[in-house]
Amino acid sequence: MNRLLKTVIENNRKWISEGKVASYIPELSKMDKNLLGISVCTLGGEEYWEGDAEVKFTIQSISKIVTLMLAIIDNGEDYVFSKVGMEPTETAFNSIVNLEAKESHKPINPMINAGAIVVASMVAGKDSDEKFDRILKFTRKISGNNNIDINLNVYTSEKETGHRNRALAYFMKSTGALKGDVEEILDVYFKQCSIEITCKDLARIGVMLANDGVSPYTGDRIVPRYVARIVKTIMVTCGMYDASGNFAVHIGIPAKSGVGGGIVACAPRRMGIGVLGTALDEKGNSIAGTKILEELSKQLDLSIF
């Protein structure tokens, strides 16, 4: 497996030159464009990694699957999906278009920024600090890493420059789609996106989902089976933003990307995969990371379709 991982990294390193690091969050623009790593965890609890698999980076939009799991556990799926849809979108992850066009003004799915902001508002807690504390502890639990923490520099950078997210949130507040104190909800959202992880952490989250919510290391149930099923399904349809259809055709496994360059993926009942490739394509997905997953999926016949 390690030889295969080394091969897929080297075969796809060339794609880095065609991407660029996220620039709209100043702190992310400082990232090394050439970082590339992968980690794989099997259902038997074996771990393999190559490249920059132990380099820390911020979770960004991958946190959306974390808060979605927590919100469903806290509120039940019927309530959560009465506030946010579950349909794919052809518009960008930070677009306001669908919020204006839809009669209900409900965000179209939980993987776009507007939807994730609504989901963050549904995480239980008396204030933003308690909500985020629960999100951080849950991230540590599902990854099996109690050392995971927030990158305060990225959090500050996001909070100071998150004007589009503020616009989305205040628009939803004006239509009644978002309940609660907007700045408190945004604070939770900016913090959750600034959690720092590695490829290894992502692979462990992926293998928990691949194992229907059960840790292959301890045998303990981490999340209810139905929650894991919902999240994996939404990862397939919406997890790679408006490139989700293309990803499903060419790679064919549940995955979620973030503009920090990470991708978490899972091959149900086989393995979890974490990838880091900081150079992004025009959709906001890791360009080399996506190509690595495509080659790995073909080599190991991972597609669920």
Curated annotation (Swiss-Prot):
Enzyme Commission number: 3.5.1.2
Amino-acid positions noted as binding substrate in the UniProt annotation, renumbered to this chain: S61, N113, E158, N165, Y189, Y241, V259
Molecular function GO terms recorded: glutaminase activity
Alphabetical GO biological process terms: glutamate biosynthetic process; glutamine catabolic process
Keywords: Hydrolase
Top EC class of this enzyme: hydrolase
Signal peptide interval: none
InterPro entries with a match to the protein in the record: Beta-lactam/transpept-like, Glutaminase
Catalytic activity: L-glutamine + H2O = L-glutamate + NH4(+)
UniProt keyword annotation of Hydrolase present: yes
Keyword Lipoprotein in annotation: no
PANTHER family: GLUTAMINASE
Assembly, per entry: Homotetramer.
Family indicated by similarity: Belongs to the glutaminase family.
Record's protein name: Glutaminase
Lineage of producing organism: Bacteria, Bacillati, Bacillota, Clostridia, Eubacteriales
